[in-house]
Amino acid sequence: MNIDPDKPSDVPMEYLLPSIQASMAYAIGGNTAVRTTNIWMQYFDGVDRQSLAEGRYNITSADVNDLWENLYAQPMMDCKSLISKAEDKNSPHYAGVAKVCMATCLGTLTNLFGDIPYSEAFLGNEGNLQPAYESQEDIYGIIDAILEEAIADLNSEENAVAMSTPDPNDPPFDYIFDGDIDLWIKTAYALKARYALNI
């Protein structure tokens, strides 16, 4: 009776993907992962506020935690949810895209932090608040396996839910490639090659 339409308890999978992509863009492309590392490599200099402190190598645990939380709690958790929903609805293209996004997040985290949690990382709702860490080498193997699954999903002939919006006037469900599966497959292969160089 008193249901707030602006607070859904279950988000349709089509609407998870734009949220995943937007939060990935912020965490990977516009936050600590890029700003701090580029300041430290002297590609540019921090001259004001937080960037000034980072330019003086004064980084706090909050700065690092922000990146960690922005990847695990947002896009990666949503990727797990999207993969599950896509598999339930026979929509392997959505599952494949979510797996490419998951692999991208994992690759970013392991490149920055080395050993990270994955197998137990999404069990917080089940009470596991201290997931086991896996070695960076194992994470690269996991990334490769996830991307293999993604490629198989993206090559699937059967897909119950289209990646494109029904009305061309609506914003796309896929902000990155607008539902172009071939581009997602190419991205998966490119990521496989990129992370194979780290093994």
Where are these regions (language model features)?
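Membrane-proximal, proline-rich intrinsically disordered regions
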Residues: M1-S51, G55-N58, N70
